[in-house]
Amino acid sequence: MTASSKMTSSTTLLSLFMKEDEEGRNKKTTTSTTLESLLMKERRNWVDLPPELTTSILLRLSLTDILDNAQKVCKEWRRICKDPSMWRKINTRDCLMYNFDFVSMCRHIVDLSQGGLLEINVDEHFLSDSLLSYITDRNLRSLGLGMCFPRVTKLGVVNAIAKIPLLETLEVTHSCIKLDLKAIGHACPQLKTLKLNSLGRLWPASDKYDSNVLDDMGPLECDDDALAIAESMPKLHHLQLMANRLTNTGLNAILDGCPHLEHLDVRKCFRISLVGNLEKRCLEMIKELRRPGDSTADYPYNGV
């Protein structure tokens, strides 16, 4: 079998182990199609690595690699993969191509944390009020909800987030619902980072202002989100509001209500005019400012 037929995930896992080889011995590539045979043909017995080193390496793998490959190599790796410390931070984005029940998979990996889950990013349209409630039955510090999730309701989000008062980071991208930011802010008094982005759902992918597109999207100016943030999130340090319809009035309210704000991203917020006193105020208060017309090339959901 040719080298091109090797499993991508197996190659990824092997390369990580080779990086940790302190002996610096020359390694030869293999054309095997399985992770087990790849490892067996290597000079070094990777299974005999110290547990803490193995854990460090496995933590760098995707969920797909861990669930499909790593935990099946041997008993020791399976034991490590089932350790709750492996599941403190979870990102399900790499599981979008899985051909099985996403809900069951998500519940399974949440269960593996045994209540120790601190950070999770769920980028999947199968998300529902029920699954969100299940996820937030933990002491989360960071919650990311990406893509459009039509089966999640406004009340479902509020009820779920109300269960995690220690939440420090919240990211919501491409939401199909208007969030009750005031209720969320009051429920999470420790919130330091908020990312609320509509880019890709409501706005064109290019960085050009297109009034023909914008005029079909309902109210052209709306400061509801900005005023709710200003009123209920005084401890914010990092705020990202991409493709929001806030105006100068809303931005001024945020600067008044969030005195600790240091990072502000208002790309695609074309109802803001950063000139004069408002621009001066932002430059004096904000350490890192992303303006409405700045490029969104580094935005992970660009083109989604």
UniProtKB/Swiss-Prot annotation:
Pfam families: F-box-like (PF12937). Transmembrane segments: none annotated. The keyword Repeat applies. This is Putative F-box/LRR-repeat protein 21. LRR repeats lie at residues 132-159, 173-198, 218-241, 243-268. Gene3D superfamilies: 1.20.1280.50, Ribonuclease Inhibitor (3.80.10.10). The lineage of its organism: Eukaryota, Viridiplantae, Streptophyta, Embryophyta, Tracheophyta. The gene is FBL21. Keywords: Leucine-rich repeat, Repeat. One of its GO terms (molecular function) is SCF ubiquitin ligase complex binding. The keyword Repeat applies. SMART domains: FBOX. Residues 43-90 form the F-box domain.
